[in-house]
Amino acid sequence: MKKSIILAIGNELVEGIIIDTNSKYISKKLLEIGYKTVAINTLPDDLEILVEEIRDSLKKADLLITTGGLGPTEDDLTREAISKTVGKELIFNEKLYNSILKKVKEFHSEIPKNIEKQAWVINGARIIENPVGTAPGQILQIGEKQIIILPGPPVEMKPIFEESLKFLEKFEKIYQKRIKTLGIPEAILVEKYKDIIYKYKDVNVATLASHISGVELRFTGKKEKVDEIVKLLKEKLSDHIYALDNETIEEVVFKKLEGKSVSFAESCTGGLISAKFVSIPGISKVFKGAIVAYSNKVKEKVLNVNKNTIQKYGAVSKECVMEMAKEVSYFLDTDYAVAVSGIAGPTGGTKEKPVGTVWICAYKRENDYYLVEKFFFRGNREIIREKSALNAFNLLRRILS
């Protein structure tokens, strides 16, 4: 696989004023045509540093891509740095200059004196005009190496980068699958299933742990090998794997319902589960509605939860969520239901039931089947609510399976 390096250039990036979103986009696109990005470096507008990094990158990679530093000001130094590094002079392109002037005149009555800087290009470079702004892109061949020079603003970078891909040699397309898991820590997941995860040395494995959405495993390599690993993990981790690739858990649940209906009884999530579900187009085919039973009185009066249940076990209990789930399924006449009750904090916790204690129940009306679990979530109020919603969908997914 060919190697690529991306250099994101600009003081505003180094100082954290602007977040670099370009590199993620570029790296993903390059992987699709057979280039593996081995480094992404953020650099200041400093000529010496730029020259050193460009020289070092060309030793390590087949393709170098730079973003930023192509403006008309004195601190825009990418052109100069590349010119100095590869030993090719900057030349003035009259045709490009006239094109830039035409664009500037459309929006400004006065022409900035320094705008001509953007018409200086590296000798021998292929010019890719900017359809949005004024700084053009450039493609340079240095022996067997290639350099793609792109502007920094994403709205300008993307169309120029897409055009530049036409001039890159296409290699074997790389195949990638992503597995999203819940309820199993990264360390345990990797240790317990390492023989499957690392079955093939030529399949690249990346793990990404999130404090809300669990652990994601990414496998990159030949299709047949990646698919085999995914198949084996799905067999072992059916309770934990909730989605693949770009799927959300809400979309997975929607597909699994297959015309069956569902309702929610929400307490600590306060309607969050419903809000996430209705973001899916066509969800009215399966979702009948929800009851936000935040107070005990609403649980008793609307959901018909037995008052003795709450007095004996509390609203945050297995017994309470089981009644909530069953009652909402009958009240709204649905095949399935999910109920959630917990303590989101920051107050309200006790020694027996600390902040973060959440009970979730998924209910199947056909055979009066309950799937109930107790969770202890860490984090602030919003994180606890998010985790509760995600795990509520996962319990529903499991009961549907």
Curated annotation (Swiss-Prot):
Pfam families xref list: CinA, CinA_KH, MoCF_biosynth
Transmembrane annotation, as ranges: none
Matches recorded under InterPro entries: CinA, CinA-like_C, CinA_C, CinA_KH, Competence-induced_CinA, MoaB/Mog-like_dom_sf, MoaB/Mog_dom
Disulfide bonds: none
NCBIfam families linked to this entry: cinA_nterm, molyb_syn, PncC_domain, PRK00549.1
Family membership: Belongs to the CinA family.
PANTHER family in UniProt: NICOTINAMIDE-NUCLEOTIDE AMIDOHYDROLASE PNCC, NMN AMIDOHYDROLASE-LIKE PROTEIN YFAY
Entry protein name: CinA-like protein
